[in-house]
Structures are given as C-alpha cells and as structure tokens.
C-alpha cells in the first residue's frame, strides 16, 4: 500500500463527458465537471481511511471504513449511499441513489492512479488518470 499518503494530481480523462451526460446532467453542468481537475490522496487512520480531494472549489474529505456503507450528499443535494472497499492496490467505490448506481474503481500502480467509471444507466466506460 505504498500509495497511501501520496498526492495524485489529475492528468487526463477519457469519455468522462459521456458518463456525466448518462447521469442526466445538463450541458452546463457537464462543462463545469469537465473543468474539475482535482488532486487526490488516501490516508489510513487506524481502521478507517480518509479520501481527500482538493480542487479550485475547495477540499472535500471523506472518512470511511472498508466495506461499510455510508450516507452522503452530492452536489445538488442528491442523497446517496456509498461503499468503499479497499483490496490491495485497488479501492472500489460503489454509489447508489434513486437514479441508479455508479462504480469508481481506483487502481494505484506506483506513481499512477487510474479511475475506471461505470454506471447502471450507461453502457460506456470512462477513465480519469492521475500522477503522483
């Protein structure tokens, strides 16, 4: 778990706009999210983890326990249930809401982080890449 504590900065993305459109965002919202190029960091604190995302909009910290479902609210006030599972160099986040589910699979490989994004409402796959 050499990736713990490393800061990964956004590098590039593939098909992210397709994912955003599939979850019903307006063109204006899609354009805003396409500008979202955060850095991310995962820290372990005892039995819990803290996922830290920093962007021009500020800092968001999410504390979770692997395999335990938590309640959260995303931009726009939509309530969601999220489960993070940590397995070696992979952190899988499953998000469930009234609109469906999405999976964010974060694969850490040295100084690279690849996030694979899928959704129950979309046949496509999106990727976001980060570098430490």
UniProtKB/Swiss-Prot annotation:
Key words of the record: Cytoplasm, Lipid-binding, Transport
Gene Ontology CC entries for this record: cytoplasm
Main location class: cytoplasm
Residues that coordinate or bind a fatty acid: 106, 128-130
Tissue: Midgut.
One MF term in the entry's GO annotations: lipid binding
Domain notes for this protein: Forms a beta-barrel structure that accommodates hydrophobic ligands in its interior.
Role, per record: Binds fatty acids in a 1:1 molar ratio.
Quaternary structure and partners: Monomer.
Entry's family note: Belongs to the calycin superfamily. Fatty-acid binding protein (FABP) family.
Protein name, as recorded: Fatty acid-binding protein 1
């Amino acid at each position: 778990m050499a990736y713990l504590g490393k800061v990964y900065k956004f590098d590039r993305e593939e098909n992210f706009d397709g994912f955003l459109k599939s979850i019903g965002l307006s063109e204006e919202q899609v354009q805003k999210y396409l500008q979202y190029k955060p850095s991310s960091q995962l820290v372990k604190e005892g039995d819990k983890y803290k996922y830290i995302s920093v962007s021009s909009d500020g800092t968001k910290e999410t504390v979770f326990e692997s395999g335990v479902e938590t309640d959260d609210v995303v931009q726009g006030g939509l309530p969601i249930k999220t489960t993070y599972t940590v397995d070696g160099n992979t952190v899988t986040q499953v998000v469930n809401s009234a609109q469906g589910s999405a999976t964010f699979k974060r694969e850490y490989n040295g100084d690279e982080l690849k996030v694979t994004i899928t959704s129950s409402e979309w046949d496509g796959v999106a990727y976001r890449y980060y570098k430490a």
